[in-house]
Amino acid sequence: MSKKLRIIFAGTPDFAARHLDALLSSGHQIVGVFTQPDRPAGRGKKLMPGPVKVLAEKHNLPVFQPVSLRPQENQQLVSDLNADVMVVVAYGLILPKAVLDMPRLGCINVHGSLLPRWRGAAPIQRSLWAGDSETGVTIMRMDVGLDTGDMLYKLACPITAEDTSATLYDKLADLGPQGLIETLQQLADGKAQPEVQDEAFVTYAEKLSKEEAQLDWSLSAAQLERCIRAFNPWPMSWMTIDEQPVKIWKASVINREAKAEPGTIIEATREGIQVATADGILNLESLQPAGKKAMSAQDLLNSRREWFTPGTRLA
């Protein structure tokens, strides 16, 4: 293989762990792993390690969990490892310029979009909601900006009409390691060809909120269907029926004129709950009332048919 690199890996969730797993079999030397501090989880709020820490400890790698990399003593942890490159994947902490400049070859990041489209925190969800036909991963050299660094490698994948954020996440988690290993080989061989991002094509993927997951019936059926897929599995699209929140797991578009005010129930059958939108009809197929598991429209109608009387306006 190419020259063996000394690598610091920084990441926290499962998406990052899949990249660390690929590095473990790449032949490069992982000299340290930075990951976020353990977080309370579950009903007992017990402190639990993230997937990257679990994998790193399984392979006896040195693990560091600073709350911030701004203090000088925490930056010294990075410096002391004398790394050739730092690989950052969904780490969750800001890297100050001093840290970015420490590795000989700099810091590189795996980002879940085809930059410069969808810089920011939620590129997978935003690409789905926008109706993009494809997305992918970009390996970039990090600088002090928000996903503004020069691009080193890009891999694309199609977005299908069935994709949710969960399925797209899995696709990109498989693509990313391929691009990362190839990029590291290019860096080691001195063959990397950085490409400056074109600012004319920049879009931003703002962090998701539970509030924007509430279905807005003034949008079209196509937009709402994409919203439902984009917000699955978090924070989940929802609506209010009889003053109770109901999450929507799956829906489809019926391309015909609603002939009713947006948010009005048109029909309720075993195939779904048909709701008028600003353009077309949204057919709700899988729903989850508060405190219940997700169920088909038919199962929900069996217990709550009074909720779905044609002519009822949904909030």
Curated annotation (Swiss-Prot):
What EC number is given for this enzyme? 2.1.2.9
Question: What Gene Ontology cellular component terms go with this record?
Answer: cytosol
Matching Pfam families: Formyl_trans_C, Formyl_trans_N
Q: Which CDD domains does the record match to this protein?
A: FMT_core_Met-tRNA-FMT_N, Met_tRNA_FMT_C
GO molecular function of the protein, one example?
methionyl-tRNA formyltransferase activity
Disulfide feature: none
Show the InterPro entries listed in the entry. Fmt, Formyl_trans_C, Formyl_trans_C_sf, Formyl_transf_N, Formyl_transf_N_sf, Formyl_transferase-like_C_sf, GART_AS, Met-tRNA-FMT_C
Provide the alphabetized UniProt keywords.
Answer: Protein biosynthesis, Transferase
Q: Which residues bind (6S)-5,6,7,8-tetrahydrofolate?
A: S113, L114, L115, P116
Q: What does this protein do?
A: Attaches a formyl group to the free amino group of methionyl-tRNA(fMet). The formyl group appears to play a dual role in the initiator identity of N-formylmethionyl-tRNA by promoting its recognition by IF2 and preventing the misappropriation of this tRNA by the elongation apparatus.
Name recorded for this polypeptide: Methionyl-tRNA formyltransferase
Protein's organism: Enterobacter sp. (strain 638)
**What lineage is on file?**
Bacteria, Pseudomonadati, Pseudomonadota, Gammaproteobacteria, Enterobacterales
